[in-house]
Amino acid sequence: MAKYRKLGRTSSQRKALLRSQVTALIENGKIVTTEARAKEVKKMAEKLITLAVKEKDNFETVKVSAKVPKKDAEGKRVKEVVDGKKVTVYETVEKEIKKDLPSRLHARKQMDKVLYTVTEVPTAAAGKKKNTKTVDLTNKLFDEIAPKYAGRQGGYTRIVKIGLRKGDAAMEVLLELV
C-alpha cells in the first residue's frame, strides 16, 4: 500500500508541485486544485501548521545594541570630516529581538525545507526588481496562523468541491485554511 499519491509525475516533479501548492496555500489562505492534489497538499500543510502551533511561544527576547548610521532629514547618511576624510557618523541603538530556542529553530528549518521563498511585487512595479520584498512564510506561520489555531487539535484546512473541470472532467476543489 502506498504512503502517498503519485499524481502521474516523477518524484522531483511531484515534490516541486506539492511544495509550490503548499506555499501558495500558506501565502494566500486558499487554492483551487484537483481533489487528489488537494488531499496531498492538505497532509503537508496540516503538519506545518501543527509544528507552528506547538512552537509558537518557544522563543526568548534578547536586548541587542547595534550601530546604525545617523541620517539627516532627507534620509541620507550624516558625514563628518576626520583627518581630511569623510566618515559616516554612527549611533548606538538598543533593540529587542526574538531568539528562537533550539526546538523552534528546528521547526523553522523543517518548514523552510517545504516552503519556497515568496517575492511580493507591487502592481505598479510589475516586471521590475525595484520595490520588491520577500515574504517570510515561516514567520507568517508562527506569528499569524499559529495563534489563530492555538486551541484547535488539527483540522486546520477544509476541502470544498467545486465541480468538474471543463478540459478533462477532473474534480476541482477549493482547499482553504479554516
Swiss-Prot record:
Domain of life: Bacteria
GO MF annotation terms: structural constituent of ribosome
The UniProt record lists the keyword Nucleotide-binding: no
One GO term of the biological process aspect: translation
GO cellular component: cytosolic large ribosomal subunit
A Pfam family reported for this protein in Swiss-Prot or TrEMBL: Ribosomal_L17
InterPro entries: Ribosomal_bL17, Ribosomal_bL17_sf
Keywords: Ribonucleoprotein, Ribosomal protein
Keyword Transmembrane helix included in the entry's annotation: no
Subunit: Part of the 50S ribosomal subunit. Contacts protein L32.
Family label: Belongs to the bacterial ribosomal protein bL17 family.
Name this polypeptide is given: Large ribosomal subunit protein bL17
Organism annotation: Lachnospira eligens (strain ATCC 27750 / DSM 3376 / VPI C15-48 / C15-B4)
Gene name, Swiss-Prot/TrEMBL: rplQ
